[in-house]
Structure formats: C-alpha cells, structure tokens
C-alpha cells in the first residue's frame, strides 16, 4: 500500500543523510529525502549557487518521486527557503503539497544581505559556529573541513539570493517551527505573509539544530499538520 509522503529538504551543508535521525522513530509517512548536487549520493556533480537552479533541481526530484498520495514538503534552515520556492513550482505544476513545514528559519527577508559566502576561512567557520555550531569532530579535522566548506559556501550563496523568495506567496498552509534560543525566533510569524491559507507557529526548546533533541515533537507536528491541512481541502 502506498503511504503519504514526506519530502525532506536539508540544511546548508546537508545531504539526503541529514534526516536519518528520524528513521529510529515510527513515522507514518514514506520519508523521501532529496539533496542538492555536490554532496551525498551526488557528490560528483557540480555544486549549485543559484536559488532558481536549486529549486528547479529539487522540484524535478520531487516530481519524479511522487506516488500519487498526498504529501508534505519539510525543510530545515536552507531547506525552508528552498521549500517555499519548490512549493510555488509544485502548485504551478498542479501537483500541490498538502502543506509546507519549515524549521530553523524565520522566513525570507530577515537575514542581512551581507555576502557571508566570501568570508575568509577562519571568519567563515566562526560565523557557522555562531549560527548553530559545528560538530567537534569536524572542527578537529582539516580534511573534513576542506571537503565541507566549499559545499557550505555554495549553499550560502543560494541563501544570499533570498530576494527571489521574498515575494513568493503560496496557496499551501505553512507550519513554522523554531527553537526558543534561535536568533530570529521572535519573528517566526514572518512566514504568515507567504501563504494565502492557514499559518501555525511552534516554538520548541533548543538552538538552531533543536530538531535532533525534539524528534517526537517534530513527528507529532508532521502528523497534526497533515491532518489539519487535509481538513482544509
């Protein structure tokens, strides 16, 4: 039997493996992680630095994997920004998601337009630590840093084209989730202006990667949001 689908859009520097932590819990969805080129299973492909190219790439992956059942788009951080653009493309393609769930991101237009992707290596690493921290094992390995920093720089270039997303308004309901210690958590309602439908915010405990410590709550939000959005159809 086909299951409803949950498409997972990773954060900057992430890949299809970024949501493996969800698999240790029962989840009533077919989980379908997608990834940008240059990492994970697509490591040999050229990195993208354009917002439009990125959302078109993800849109193509999703349309290829739709099973005909209702589905949700979920993105964390960078994935949230991309999720908005992808939802817009899906709606224009007459294959709309049940809803868009975003986390770790208060929406387009809030982050200063400074060019962070071009920072010197030490400053770039310091900025990443300030935003949400890097794993200690990554900081201790120049080899790992050499591999991941070009990916992160490319992903930040995509983020820096956020002006493309600032005027996007979708028909799908939007559910926004942030950690109570995140920098822009008090502006979570910024997402409300990007939907013509319902909007619901959640604030959980934690910093930028609060999703790893709130798995059960996150899955509950997936289930509740799916059911609530289904009732709006």
Regions found by a protein language model. Give the residues of each.
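Non-catalytic, mobile gating and regulatory segments of ester bond hydrolases
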Residues: 1-233
